[in-house]
Amino acid sequence: MITKAAKNATRKKRHARVRAKLTGTAERPRLNVYRSNQHIYAQVIDDVNGVTLVSASTLDKDLALNGTSNTEAATKVGESVAKRAVEKGVKEVVFDRGGYLYHGRVKALAEAAREAGLQF
């Protein structure tokens, strides 16, 4: 009998492997991405102090995402999190894709964050 592991379980294993080697500091925090079926979330995290410096998601009221596609929404979230991070004085981050493939919504968010001023 063929048993196939659930996609989310394999993603969590992949994320745990990467997180063992990847940490964010105050000088270079971690840009974490979480993707659900309907929304996408991004946080800039200082792992040394255990503090979220900046966050943005498709649930934010100020983004006005009515009627946009998922990749367009991810692009706006990437721009928003980058602008907020630059305002807080963060210019360089470590990108943590959360175990997701660098494709689609995750890629759109990352490229928008780069264009808005974050370096990674």
Curated annotation (Swiss-Prot):
CDD domains given in the database record: Ribosomal_L18_L5e
Record keywords, A-Z: Ribonucleoprotein, Ribosomal protein, RNA-binding, rRNA-binding
Region (Disordered): 1-24
Pfam families reported in the protein's UniProt record: Ribosomal_L18p (PF00861)
An example Gene Ontology molecular-function term: structural constituent of ribosome
GO terms under biological process: translation
Compositional bias (Basic residues): 9-20
Superkingdom of the organism of origin: Bacteria
InterPro entries: Ribosomal_uL18_bac-type, Ribosomal_uL18_bac/euk
Cellular compartments per GO CC: cytosolic large ribosomal subunit
UniProt key word Iron: no
Subunit structure: Part of the 50S ribosomal subunit; part of the 5S rRNA/L5/L18/L25 subcomplex. Contacts the 5S and 23S rRNAs.
Assigned protein family: Belongs to the universal ribosomal protein uL18 family.
Described function: This is one of the proteins that bind and probably mediate the attachment of the 5S RNA into the large ribosomal subunit, where it forms part of the central protuberance.
Protein name stated in the entry: Large ribosomal subunit protein uL18
Organism expressing this protein natively: Bacillus mycoides (strain KBAB4) (Bacillus weihenstephanensis)
Species lineage: Bacteria, Bacillati, Bacillota, Bacilli, Bacillales
